[in-house]
A protein has these predicted regions:
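Polar/charged low-complexity regulatory segments
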Residues: 1-181
Length: 181
């Protein structure tokens, strides 16, 4: 993705990232609001090459570690939903909402990776009373939830192999998996 930058654009934008990951809405916004080709003649060629490389990644490449699996999970937010899904999920407003969700998560992942890559672990939590369970609407996006399950399992396995997960944290991860299933 760093190839989508030059002296005028020192970093690829979040819209570049999400467009490469398949968001048609991100592509539309890039073209209509920013039009990077206007300031950089080689942008479209470079973009198409990077997108082609990303599209050709194997599932093993997409899920080789926690970072790439997280990105793979976000890719599922970029889909356009076919007939049969609720109408409110099949319009531009929904695509914009999903794009904002993916961009927010990507920004947090990038932030954590850059700033906290070598962070030491800290014990969290206390003896507080559990809050009441809240019920609400769950978006019918099974692909995203399946990828989150995969990400959670991969995280647990990686931490277990390094003796970096306590029994209580493992139980919390299993609860997350159960909730997502």
């Amino acid at each position: 993705l760093s190839r989508l930058s030059n002296e005028k654009r020192p970093f690829p934008s979040g819209l570049d990232v999400m467009a490469v990951f398949g968001s048609q809405r991100a592509e539309e916004l890039l073209d209509s609001l920013y039009n990077p080709s206007k300031e950089w003649d080689g942008y479209k060629k470079e973009y198409n090459e990077v997108k082609s490389e990303f599209d050709e990644r194997s599932i093993k490449d997409k899920t080789g570690n926690i970072y790439t699996t997280w990105l793979y999970s976000l890719e599922s937010l970029n889909q356009r939903f076919p007939e049969g899904y609720p109408n409110f999920m099949r319009n531009k407003a929904w695509e914009s909402k999903s794009l904002a969700t993916a961009l927010g998560s990507w920004a947090e992942l990038r932030h954590d990776t850059i700033l906290y890559g070598a962070q030491s672990s800290v014990e969290c939590g206390g003896e507080e009373e559990e809050p009441p369970k809240v019920t609400g609407y769950v978006e019918p996006n099974p692909e995203f939830y399946n990828r989150l399950i995969w990400l959670t399992k991969q995280t647990m396995e990686g931490l277990s192999q390094r003796n970096g997960i306590s029994d209580s944290m493992k139980e919390k991860c299993e609860n997350i998996i159960e909730l997502l299933e």
